[in-house]
Amino acid sequence: MFVRKSCYSLINATRRCLRYRQLSSTTAGTVGTTAPTANISLNDEPQPAAAEMDEFTKEFLRNRIEVSDIQRLILSAGSSVAALVDPRRHDMIACLGETTGREALEKILHYMRSTEEGQRILVEKPRINTRTVDMEALKKMPEHTFGYTYVKFMEDNNITPDSRMEVRFLDEPGLAYVMTRYRETHDMVHAILDMPTNMLGEVTVKWVEALNTGLPMCYGGAVFGAFRLRTKQRQNYLRKYLPWALRTGNRIKPLMGVYWEKRWEQDVTELRKELNIELLAP
């Protein structure tokens, strides 16, 4: 009983902190005639002038919420408990990813800067939603292409690329874009791995993503999500899915460096071979 009360107290504190920071952010953005000047990037370098910023950076700096170290700790602890209590709280899961993933995001950013394809992603900062991706055109592609595989996966699972939350609790635009890219390409990882969006599929993909990206929230989702599997699912998970996920996560190439949108026309089998992906046997 004490543990339960403590958990809900922590969750309520997180909600209050979220509401307070959102109110503060809204007020700061509407009062006065100048924009806030406290936005500092990595190594305390000043932000570039607005005219030099890309659209993602402008939008991120308008909407981000600055938090102190104490507030970040509260958000991290509270969101982790809330996500465990109710895995459907995508806002809490998103908050957890942003407040615990800085080190992993920095490593991903460093890797992306080291490859030609990754550099192109970081320069162009593509977004994935129904305004930027022509889903109807993908439907008309040959069935063996990655583009067709992706859109069929989205339709079969009745999901949309427009459902991803904005990044708000990171303080550096580069890291914010990496987190945004992770969220927006999550469905593409499902598609390339041929994993459904049910609980078993999500837990399996989270293991692959955890080992591939190092993001703490992925490890948390993989470990604690498994406890929510039904008995039969848990048996299949331990016997087939978990060993495959661990093997796959350790052997495949870094997926965050893949410019998926430039691979629409590529043969999906060829793409999987390039990334060292072997599908789970039926």
Curated annotation (Swiss-Prot):
It is a peripheral membrane protein. It holds the Pfam family Coq4. Zn(2+) binds at H186, D187, H190, E202. One of its GO terms (cellular component) is mitochondrion. Component of a multi-subunit COQ enzyme complex. HAMAP family: Coq4. Its main location: mitochondrion. InterPro entries: Coq4, Coq4_euk. It is found in: Mitochondrion inner membrane. GO terms for biological process: ubiquinone biosynthetic process. Its cofactor is Zn(2+). This is Ubiquinone biosynthesis protein COQ4 homolog, mitochondrial. It catalyses: a 4-hydroxy-3-methoxy-5-(all-trans-polyprenyl)benzoate + H(+) = a 2-methoxy-6-(all-trans-polyprenyl)phenol + CO2. Lyase that catalyzes the C1-decarboxylation of 4-hydroxy-3-methoxy-5-(all-trans-polyprenyl)benzoic acid into 2-methoxy-6-(all-trans-polyprenyl)phenol during ubiquinone biosynthesis. Its EC number is 4.1.1.130. Belongs to the COQ4 family. Residues 1-30 form a transit peptide. Keywords: Lyase, Membrane, Metal-binding, Mitochondrion, Mitochondrion inner membrane, Transit peptide, Ubiquinone biosynthesis, Zinc. It comes from the Eukaryota. Pathway: Cofactor biosynthesis; ubiquinone biosynthesis. It is an enzyme of class 4 (lyase).
